[in-house]
Amino acid sequence: MKIRIGHGFDVHKFGAARPLILCGVEVPYETGLVAHSDGDVVLHAISDAILGALALGDIGKHFPDTDAAYKGADSRVLLRHCYALARAKGFVLGNLDVTIIAQVPKMAPHIEAMRQILAADLTSELDDINVKATTTEHLGFTGRKEGIAVEAVVLMTRKHD
């Protein structure tokens, strides 16, 4: 069996007059995230982790913010595309670990719904998907409630014939 590890990181600032979407879940908050797509910073980090594990670049290469086709794009569609690229190379998700770094809003009420969506989109078992949240204790831009950062780590596996 061949394994690959990928790490993804993304940041978006608050300020868009749109819903806050994280892992495909609408999280109640006063503002959304500024982005070319729907601003789902979590799915962007996961997509980058998958692409990175397979040496396929990053989401900016695959979905450039200079391309009008991706304006307001549903990040779940982008994630599923990245995962399809991995599957085409014979890889499947072993497990996923995500850390959402945000002072606001509270993530705990939404974590299970996020995990369910990720398991469905990545055709994985729920116990292979972990989503957790933390704050920076009011330090830095996330602590000042200016935006959200996310780190994602994936283990991708391929079984040899």
Curated annotation (Swiss-Prot):
**A Gene Ontology molecular-function term?**
2-C-methyl-D-erythritol 2,4-cyclodiphosphate synthase activity
Q: What class of enzyme is it?
A: lyase
Catalysed reaction per UniProt? 4-CDP-2-C-methyl-D-erythritol 2-phosphate = 2-C-methyl-D-erythritol 2,4-cyclic diphosphate + CMP
Q: Which domain of life is it from?
A: Bacteria
- Pathway involvement of the protein, from the record: Isoprenoid biosynthesis; isopentenyl diphosphate biosynthesis via DXP pathway; isopentenyl diphosphate from 1-deoxy-D-xylulose 5-phosphate: step 4/6
Q: Where is this site: Transition state stabilizer?
A: H36, T135
Q: Which Gene3D superfamilies match?
A: 2-C-methyl-D-erythritol 2,4-cyclodiphosphate synthase (3.30.1330.50)
Stored PROSITE patterns: ISPF (PS01350)
- Cofactor binding annotation: Binds 1 divalent metal cation per subunit.
Q: Where does a divalent metal cation bind?
A: D10, H12, H44
Q: Which cofactor does it need?
A: a divalent metal cation
The record ties this protein, via CDD domains, to: MECDP_synthase
The processes (GO biological process) annotated in the record are: isopentenyl diphosphate biosynthetic process, methylerythritol 4-phosphate pathway; terpenoid biosynthetic process
Known function? Involved in the biosynthesis of isopentenyl diphosphate (IPP) and dimethylallyl diphosphate (DMAPP), two major building blocks of isoprenoid compounds. Catalyzes the conversion of 4-diphosphocytidyl-2-C-methyl-D-erythritol 2-phosphate (CDP-ME2P) to 2-C-methyl-D-erythritol 2,4-cyclodiphosphate (ME-CPP) with a corresponding release of cytidine 5-monophosphate (CMP).
HAMAP family, sorted: IspF
Name assigned to this protein: 2-C-methyl-D-erythritol 2,4-cyclodiphosphate synthase
What is the organism field in this record? Shewanella baltica (strain OS223)
Q: What is the lineage of its organism?
A: Bacteria, Pseudomonadati, Pseudomonadota, Gammaproteobacteria, Alteromonadales
